[in-house]
Amino acid sequence: MICAVDCGVAVNPDVIAAQMEGGIGFGLGAALYGAITLKDGHVEQSNFDSYQVLRIDKMPKVEVYIVPSTEAPTGVGEPGVAPIGPAVANAAFAATGKRHRVLPFSAAGTA
């Protein structure tokens, strides 16, 4: 997986890379498995035995490119979270020709 981030002057590139990797991991887990279901008014997934998360052995290698900039540092936040679902959906479309429009993908039987 490859990502790029433009956050102004990179004060600490290692922290920026770690933040992007973590955001991508969180977003990927949510896109693949993040279903929350209710039964009789209660959440069925009460702990990690019933709520699937992305495990470390399923985390892809992430290459982080920091865009060189002379702008003031802006902070990194979680920019890796939001685009990962659409990126995976587009990759699946490129591979299969089928559009996936429901998240998590596991809810549609495609994860």
Predicted regions and their residues:
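Cofactor-binding beta-sheet edge motifs in enzyme active sites
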Residues: M1-A111
